[in-house]
Amino acid sequence: MNAPHPDEALLRRFEPVLRLTKGDRFFPMDVEPYVRACSLWVQRPGEEPVRVVPGGKLTLETLPQQPLDGSGAVHFLRFTDPQNQPDGESRGVGALRERAVRGLRETREVFKAGRGRLARVGYVSRFVDALYSITLLARGRVPGEAAGSAAITYQGLMEEREGYSYHGRVARQEGWTVLQYWLFYPFNDWRSGFFGANDHEADWEKVHVYLAQAPDGELRPEWVAYASHNYFGDNLRRRWDDPEVEKVGEHPVVYVAAGSHASYYAPGEYLTELDLPLPRRLARIFRGMRGFWRETLGQYVGGDARDAAPFHIPFVDYARGDGLVIGEGGDRAWDPPKVISEPAPEWVSGYRGLWGLYARDPFEGEDAPAGPMYNRDKTVARAWYDPTGWAGLDKVPTPAEAAAAALERRRDLETRREELRSEIGEKAARLRKLGAEAAAVRGRSHLDARGRETRRRVADLSAELGRLRARLAADDAVAGSLSEYAGRLEAGELDPARSHISRAHRPASATELRFSRVAEAWAAVSVSLMLVIFVAIAIFEQEHLISMLVVSIAFFAFAEAGFRGRLANLVGSANIGLAAVASLVLLYEFFWQLVVAAVLVVSLYVLWDNVRELRR
């Protein structure tokens, strides 16, 4: 019997509790039976994909060999290869589709989608959503029967041996001990099962727990970070004592979104908007217009002013937590962890291919992910080589080091302040000498050129000296703050638990979900209706094209505002816009009259002000 890995006890102590959503069909599993059920393929540039290892012949030991490798080659597994179906199952495409439809119907009977996905966003997002759906017909995607086929294969594996596993890794970086829980799901059926953005074979998700050494030498949890789509940095991270971090004993609770398997801290429905970036020049124009509208005119103050692209595709992550619970106190217990030791095993470090079907999707949403160590482009993933930086923790010292780090930074500033004082003294003396020279040559015609040059040097040196003195004053203030901060830390005081979060991903509130059936129906038909009306106007009302378009746009704007409860905002914004347009029209029509009137008003004001001064 093999001795347990030394990191296993640490991983088990803080292993997460997963609360999944009712209707989800795929759960975290050991990769070994998955790989055994897959076939291995290679896609070379300009060629058709070639199967190099059939299903049932692949193992974790042979996976890293990557036969037929070459420049531009993409190796990928295929879990839903029809030739991999268990004996006794029909292998026809029609039969697979029939089983897929049956499985999807069973999922929909259990899972009921939330209300108002499209009703939560505006016309532009709905239009982009329609275009995104249309592109699925042209771009690479996972076949429609893949989810059903994957469910059948997965059920067969679970019947052989039911198990719920994670692959654990313990990384040590800059004073932090990082427990990485890699969760492998055999399939992501977000699009086909839960109205999401994509489907793809295989899904690697992760939960990180960050430990630091306490004064008594024991490792204690300080932070957690849950992977959620492509987010990274401070907004992913929560402090261990944050009320949002639900725990069962020492086990953090993770709410897993149906199909996508994104991880959240609280149950609910999360609106996820995929941004479509604009070209750089258009993005600059858009930011300028938005800044003028929000900051200069003060419109939509208090709303979501984040720096995002103007075009979003809305999707909903259903992380309800009403399904299977895996972990401490749950419906199913975790199997012993599959520890990823150091150096990493060959199946982790040697296989750089994809863990499922390579659909050749230009957006990559339908392509399977790479393993825990790599990105899809075969580069090493940041979460692997820099787990603290991935969650924005690289700038945060451990609690035991925080006060010392603040005092050390204060000493650095003190050294720089001494250097600044010396430099300021030297340049101040030089400035006084140049000032004396400038005064000496003033009024001497034969020294005019030298005088201009001296005055220029005086101005430049004075400005530089001002900047140095401003930096010294700022450093003095920062040094005082560092001393005060170190004192608070030494006294045991902590920063607010959520001070690092700039944009928390929160579930939709009850108010946001309170859409009527009429509002939902309007959201579903509005874009199509708008396009039909615009086409009809272009065909039948060419003589009144502009006026009819204005009337149509106004109708759709007011209808949308009414359904979304923003009619008052729209009326206010419309008034401001109409006032601006009216001002421009008046300026254009009566430009010279307005100029004359403005000159007369200014002259009368100056005369009145001067007469008032004489009377004092």
Where are these regions (language model features)?
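A domain-level signal for the mature, folded cores of soluble proteins
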Residues: 1-203, 215-514, 521-528
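Conserved hydrophobic/aromatic beta-strand scaffold that supports enzyme active sites
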Residues: 206-208
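Short beta-strand micro-motifs enriched in acidic
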Residues: 210-214
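Alpha-helical transmembrane segments of integral membrane proteins
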Residues: 496, 503-616
